[in-house]
Curated annotation (Swiss-Prot):
It comes from Haloarcula hispanica (strain ATCC 33960 / DSM 4426 / JCM 8911 / NBRC 102182 / NCIMB 2187 / VKM B-1755). GO terms for biological process: cell wall organization. Belongs to the halobacterial S-layer protein family. The gene is slg1. N-glycosylated on Asn-306; this N-linked glycan is a branched trisaccharide containing 2-amino-6-sulfo-2,6-dideoxy-glucose (sulfoquinovosamine). Cleaved by the archaeosortase ArtA at the C-terminus, with removal of a short hydrophobic segment. GO terms for cellular component: extracellular region; plasma membrane; S-layer. Residues 815-894 are annotated as: Disordered. It is found in: Secreted, Cell wall, S-layer; Cell membrane. This is Cell surface glycoprotein 1.
């Protein structure tokens, strides 16, 4: 018994020793914290320049303004951020230090505070990177709603000013969404009356309720500032650039007028450069950081809105070391015609700049030079050389660059000069070209050489086209070729009041038109063409050359004997003329509205008469050529007319059914929209039907109308109305409604070997055929019957064009024999019988069956011995055994819990030992 007691005593003493070790550890930890210097638990700037430091203990002595140093973005005590006062209550001795600055700190600034002269320790406390808030909410103010942008840092103050709700470390702050769901729940830091709240994780467009100490005091509505930082090729050179390119970003936001701070960071997150610009609402603002070294790549740009502190970052921008720049021609030989604008494409690599030279002062007695800049960064610059103005006008009229690229420092020289545009242009022939990367005008060793070949110009052809009177052709009509076959048809007979389009195929015109449009007073291609081309009536027969040498006259030739020519006066017909140019194909379309043209004698085209016209385009002897080049086209304008198609009895016949067609033909331009008016002469069946029709390319038109609601035997009149829908220009014809052709058909489900189907019955009022469609009424026609006479038919066998090898749906459809040849000619002729506007049909499933083949019985029978081994798979009934969860021992954390476990284990061991001894 004594041994037992001694064992218990020893175990108990051991337990006390173990417990004392843990207890000592706990006591030592607390003692170490208590012995530390005073430190900052939380720091915040709020309420227009007020700073709070929540400390973990008293400063030991009152903090004065002279004890505080302010660092803004690393600058110590800037003059406009001085400490104006220290709160008399919260002076540090209470564990809270509050003081005011001369100026509010913007949320994008870095704020650090150093407090010196404290009692004990190292006498100093430092708060770095203090939370600078953009707005302050008073928990006891009940001021209502606060609007904030997502990403702002807000200060929620509970300082007991009115409701005695001074915050403590147990004061709860709760933020709930509009549905009452808690999104944030926290407590104030000890010795702090300010809770800093980040709105980054809140949803835009939502309203949130803020409660402090159980009271709902404030609502916050979250909006989106939409601060975007984009890498844009239009403002810089993109996301993958070299050290010669420009690193720039576009910044936009929904709210403008406020400054923003853009900082460029390198791969080590070190600041490289900073810019401040005022943002514009929904407009891009460019932050340009110029050229950057490849050594610190990649870079990114962080932009912070100064007022709210909301930030956004760009994607990564990679900068590589640039290679030596090089320039070349896309094609080493470029050719065009004298008077045209030559497009020369220069390609640049590892550079934005290049210098181009065209011609040689010694060999050609002419040269022009320009400095190119690839502003859009696509590696190409298209140079336009106007051979019409070369050697005469200012340099900029000769060399130009379209689009976003640029050309500067143009210099033209050589012995070749022109006093005016009436002087001779450059001679046809080959001219040297070269291009060199860089900006130096002194080129001794060009990167690439090439040849510009200028050929003689010519007038190849002029032909006429007809377009509807309302064709609305304009000078930006880039799709004029798409009109061909729709509302533009080649013709030398044009209906009066329609538009006649003169297609001129000629080279050497482009330069004169571009000069008038770019450097003259012309606002569009039409004005440029009229300005560059002599169309003056009284000078048409003048043998003297005009300034440009270009001439167009349209002369009336049917004026009779002993009469002067009567040309169109384009100067008084400007509203009637539209020009569409296609210089790439040396083609120019001059559209003239025949309803508006005025002749030299002041008269217009009489629409009731035929007028014969001769259009001639020429390049006269002058600056562009030494010889006259021309071509002419003769055409006639005729009275507008339309003729309706009649049956053998001289009337327009339609059936009392839907989808009835009335046809005719006209001389107005294809594509014109006409109307066919059909008006009843019966009081019992009154109607007026006006379907619209489009004139086809062959001059025909087809009007479709529904007569199924009107009785057979009704008479009506029919006439064609012009484009305006009022004036009729066809004779009024008689029309009659007759009985509609009718048909019925029936087919049943059946089995077939796939070669034929059987239609149960059909009734055809005018005879015809039964066609079989596969699948549905619009499916392929797979077979048709022989001709069936008018009347009823039963058990009609239709042989299929190709045998069917699988089941299908057969759709039986009666067709007419519209051309009377008793042969099935659909499509084209032999339309289906219809009812209510739809084809008459019936359908049934056809099952494909194969003929049974009888095979001779196999006389040899193989008998397999029974398998003596039987494998049985016995599915035993599933028994649900309880799964054994292997318990996982989780180490408890905390010194108190560990000590208790150890003590319990020792006591249990002691009791077990006693039991064994007993």
């Amino acid at each position: 018994m004594t041994d037992t007691n001694e064992k218990i005593r020893s175990l108990f003493l051991t337990a006390l020793m173990v417990f004392s070790v843990f207890a000592g550890t706990i006591a030592f930890s607390g003692g170490a914290a208590a012995a530390a210097n005073v430190s900052v638990q939380q720091a915040a700037e709020y309420d227009s320049g007020t700073v709070e430091l929540a400390l973990n203990g008293s400063t030991g002595s009152t903090v004065n303004t002279g004890d505080i140093d302010i660092y803004v973005d690393g600058n110590k005590n800037p003059s406009n951020y001085g400490v104006s006062s220290v709160d008399t209550t919260d002076d540090g001795t209470t564990g809270r230090l509050q003081f005011s600055l001369d100026q509010d700190v913007q949320p994008n600034r870095n704020l650090t505070v150093k407090v010196s002269g404290l009692t004990g320790g190292d006498n100093t406390v430092v708060a770095e990177d203090i939370d600078v808030t953009s707005q302050t909410i008073d928990a006891d103010d009940d001021s209502g709603d606060t609007n904030a942008f997502r990403g702002e840092v807000l200060a929620i103050r509970a300082d007991g000013d009115t409701d005695n709700d001074d915050a403590t470390s147990s004061t709860k702050i709760v933020v709930e969404d509009s549905n009452g769901a808690v999104v944030t729940q926290d407590t104030y830091t000890a010795n702090s009356k300010v809770y800093t709240y980040e709105t980054e994780n809140l949803d835009t467009g939502e309203e949130y309720e803020v409660s402090v100490a159980g009271d709902a005091d404030e609502n916050i509505t979250i909006s989106n500032l939409d601060l975007n930082v984009n890498i844009d090729d239009d403002v810089g050179d993109g996301a993958n650039i070299d050290d010669k390119d420009t690193l720039a970003v576009n910044v936009s936001t929904t709210r403008g007028g406020e400054p923003a701070n853009a900082t460029l960071f390198n791969e080590d997150d070190d600041k490289v450069a900073t810019q401040v610009e005022s943002l514009k609402g929904n407009e891009n603002v460019v932050f340009d950081f110029g050229n950057q070294s490849a050594d610190d790549s990649p870079y990114y740009v962080k932009v912070t809105d100064n007022q709210t502190g909301v930030s956004a970052e760009s994607d990564q921008i990679n900068v590589s070391e640039s290679d030596d720049g090089e320039a070349s021609f896309e094609s080493s030989t470029v050719q065009d015609n004298i008077g045209d604008v030559v497009n020369i494409t220069v390609q640049v690599d590892n550079t934005e700049d290049a210098v181009i030279n065209i011609g040689d002062e010694n060999d050609d007695n002419y040269y022009i030079q320009g400095q190119l800049e690839d502003d859009n960064g696509d590696g190409e610059v298209t140079v336009q050389f106007n051979s019409y103005t070369a050697g005469n006008y200012s340099d900029s009229t000769v060399l130009s660059v379209p689009g976003d690229d640029d050309i500067d420092n143009i210099k033209e020289g050589g012995d070749y000069t022109r006093g005016s545009l009436s002087g001779d242009t450059l001679e046809a022939g080959s001219y040297s070209m070269n291009v060199t990367a860089g900006t130096s005008p002194d080129v001794t060793s060009p990167d690439t050489v090439g040849t510009l070949r200028l050929n003689e110009n010519s007038v190849e052809n002029i032909q006429t086209w007809a377009a509807p009177s309302d064709a609305d052709i304009d000078d930006d009509d880039v799709d004029i070729y798409d009109r061909i076959g729709e509302n533009l048809t080649q013709s030398d007979d044009v209906a009066a009041e329609d538009v006649v389009v003169h297609e001129i195929q000629a080279s050497g015109i482009e330069g004169a038109l571009e000069y008038e449009q770019e450097d003259g007073s012309a606002s569009d291609v039409t004005e440029a063409f009229i300005a560059a081309t002599d169309t003056t009536p009284y000078r048409i027969n003048d043998s003297d050359a005009t300034t440009s040498g270009l001439r167009l006259y349209v002369n009336r030739t049917d004026v009779g004997a002993n009469a002067d020519a009567n040309p169109i006066d384009f100067s008084n017909s400007s509203d009637a003329v539209t020009v569409v140019d296609d210089p790439d194909n040396n083609t120019y379309f001059v559209a003239v509205d025949t309803s508006d043209v005025v002749f030299e004698n002041g008269k217009t085209i009489v629409k009731e008469e035929d007028t014969r016209l001769n259009a001639t385009f020429s390049v006269r002897e002058g600056p562009l050529t030494d010889d006259r080049n021309s071509d002419s086209a003769i055409y006639t304008t005729s009275e507008r007319d339309a003729t309706l198609d009649l049956d053998d009895s001289g009337v327009v016949t339609v059936s009392a059914a839907a989808g009835q067609e009335v046809t005719g033909e006209t001389n107005v331009a294809p594509g014109s929209e006409l109307e066919v008016e059909m008006e009843s002469e019966s009081d019992a069946n009154p109607f007026v039907i006006r379907p619209e029709v489009d004139v086809a390319t062959d001059g025909t038109y087809t009007a479709t109308a529904d007569f199924q609601d009107y009785s057979a035997g009704t008479n009506f009149t029919v006439q064609t109305l012009d484009v305006d829908g009022d004036s009729d220009f066809s004779d009024e014809e008689d029309g009659r409604i007759v009985e509609a052709d009718t048909a019925t058909v029936s087919i049943s489900e059946q089995e077939s070997d796939g070669s034929e189907v059987v239609v149960d019955s059909a009734q055809l009022s005018e005879g015809g055929f039964i066609a079989i469609h596969a699948g549905n009424a619009s499916g392929d026609v797979v077979g048709n019957s022989e001709y069936l006479g008018a009347g009823s038919h039963e058990d009609i066998t239709v042989t299929l064009d190709e045998p069917m090898d699988e089941d299908f749906t057969a759709v039986a459809m009666p067709h007419q024999d519209t051309n009377g040849n008793e042969a099935y000619d659909f499509p084209g002729d032999d339309d289906p019988y219809t009812q209510n506007g739809s084809a008459v049909t019936d359908s049934a499933n056809v099952t494909i069956v194969e003929e049974e083949q009888t095979e001779a019985p196999d006389t040899e029978t193989e008998t397999e011995a029974p398998d003596t081994e039987t494998e049985e798979e016995t599915d035993a009934p599933a028994t649900d055994e309880p799964a054994t969860d292997e318990s996982e021992t989780t180490a408890a954390e905390g010194p108190g819990f560990t000590a208790a476990i150890a003590l319990i284990a020792l006591v249990a061991a002691a009791l077990l030992a006693v039991r064994r001894d007993n």
